[in-house]
């Protein structure tokens, strides 16, 4: 295949010419996926309310931390008869190690693509990646975002117990423990929760990294209802991530479509979108979201993911003008470039021109503002839950934990509000830091002054 033919060949044909490296990488990825396929499938099916129970390598069934302590001090029915805290810590370390290996393997896949299947020895994306790898603030954000995503994706494995056992149906599950008389008793999880409540006094509090009277380990302590707080926070991370990704995905598609249309056609098309977008942006967003949450709260759509889906659609419908405004400028810059005029003069269809020659150069900017917007959505969802709106109880949500723990801030149960509050601040800061890193990688002159429009457009994701 000649160089010119190779330049125009799709990736599929390039892989067919040299399938060896791609097959080796895919085999490794398939092996990694097989270890935790059940966790991923459970996450995807859980989004539509039909979770399945499939075996995985790092589940609590294999590395169990739910057991009981004998009068002699030994633990039974835990992994290797270890204390629940150690068994839980081993499982957490292995899950995060597994996720980190996945990240390394994805990076390896990118290097394989660069070495064997990319027709150019260098592209502007290479410099972007190098700048991002040296951006300490962006790296900080990436590490925290990575931890947040892993917490959400593997929430059932990371929690010391499950949402089903401690939150949804605690009276349908039982645990065993030795009472003060040294007798083995069987009690429902709900009854054990009542005896493990954190309510602000030393004798009614289970704080971070403590055991309750029934031998259960609580990394973040318990809630005023006695439910495990780490499990609550992990499940809440999954809810926040679901809402954020759906919202950003929908609003991002709308923003890109309108940005390309307004940049290509300009004139009345641009004016119409400006009027619609400005009208939506002029509304008090939080009040508008609260109004829609109440209005749509009694509809069938509010039952999907405990109200999370309707929240995602509301944030998408009210947030796309902000993303569109962010990428409209770069789209206008790209539309003035010579290659766009050349495509028009050769009679190329507008859809092909926008998709092939314009869209790649604004996706980098969309990624920057989307990462920052995602942090804002997490705060907004937490705020709505704090006010009693949004996610329907008893589905876990971080803002609800802040709300129910605010009366215990100055007591021994300070952890109930403090931990979710810190996590909200940390995750939102991390998304903003990651966005800053991506922005500086795309446009290295963004902090030092104005950069040339063509250079900025070319670095925004072109091949």
PLM features per residue range, with description:
Residues 36-52, 60-90, 137-138, 152, ...:
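Generic hydrophobic transmembrane alpha-helix motif, especially the helices
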């Amino acid at each position: 295949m000649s160089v010119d033919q190779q330049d125009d060949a799709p990736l599929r044909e390039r892989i067919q010419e040299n399938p060896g490296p791609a097959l080796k990488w895919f085999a490794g990825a398939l092996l990694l996926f097989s270890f935790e396929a059940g966790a991923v499938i459970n996450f995807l099916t859980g989004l539509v309310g039909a979770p399945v129970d499939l075996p995985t390598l790092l589940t609590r069934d294999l590395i169990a931390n739910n057991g009981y302590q004998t009068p002699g001090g030994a633990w039974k029915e835990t992994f290797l008869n270890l204390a629940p805290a150690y068994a839980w810590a081993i499982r957490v370390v292995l899950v995060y190690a597994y996720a980190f290996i996945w990240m390394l393997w994805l990076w390896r896949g990118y290097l394989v693509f660069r070495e064997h299947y990319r027709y150019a020895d260098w592209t502007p994306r290479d410099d972007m990646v190098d700048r991002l790898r040296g951006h300490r603030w962006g790296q900080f954000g990436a590490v925290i975002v990575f931890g947040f995503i892993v917490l959400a994706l593997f929430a059932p494995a990371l929690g010391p117990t499950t949402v089903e056992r401690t939150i949804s149906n605690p009276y349908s599950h039982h645990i065993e423990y030795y009472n003060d008389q040294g007798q083995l008793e069987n009690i429902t999880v709900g009854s054990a929760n009542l005896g493990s409540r954190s309510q602000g006094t030393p004798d009614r509090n289970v704080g971070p990294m403590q055991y309750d009277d029934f031998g259960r380990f609580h990394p973040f302590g318990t809630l005023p209802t006695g439910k495990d707080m780490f499990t609550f926070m992990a499940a809440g991370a999954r809810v926040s991530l679901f809402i954020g990704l759906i919202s950003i995905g929908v609003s991002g598609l709308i923003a890109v479509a309108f940005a390309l249309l307004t940049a290509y056609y300009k004139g009345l098309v641009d004016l119409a979108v400006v009027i619609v977008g400005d009208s939506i942006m002029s509304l008090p967003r939080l009040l508008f979201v609260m109004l829609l949450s109440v209005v749509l709260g009694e509809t069938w759509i509010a039952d999907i993911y405990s109200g999370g889906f309707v929240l995602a659609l509301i944030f998408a419908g009210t947030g796309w003008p902000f993303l569109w405004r962010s990428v409209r400028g770069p789209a206008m810059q790209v539309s003035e470039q010579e290659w766009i005029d050349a495509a028009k003069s050769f009679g190329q269809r507008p859809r092909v021109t926008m998709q092939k020659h314009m869209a790649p150069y604004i996706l980098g900017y969309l990624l920057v503002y989307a990462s920052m917007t995602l942090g804002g959505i997490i705060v907004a969802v937490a705020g709505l839950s704090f006010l009693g709106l949004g996610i329907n109880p008893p589905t876990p949500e971080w803002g609800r934990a802040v709300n129910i723990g605010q009366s215990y801030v100055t007591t021994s149960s300070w952890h109930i509000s403090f931990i979710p509050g810190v996590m909200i601040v940390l995750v939102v800061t991390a998304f903003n830091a990651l966005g800053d890193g991506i922005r500086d990688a795309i446009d290295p002159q963004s902090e030092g002054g104005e950069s040339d429009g063509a250079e900025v457009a070319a670095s925004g994701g072109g091949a």
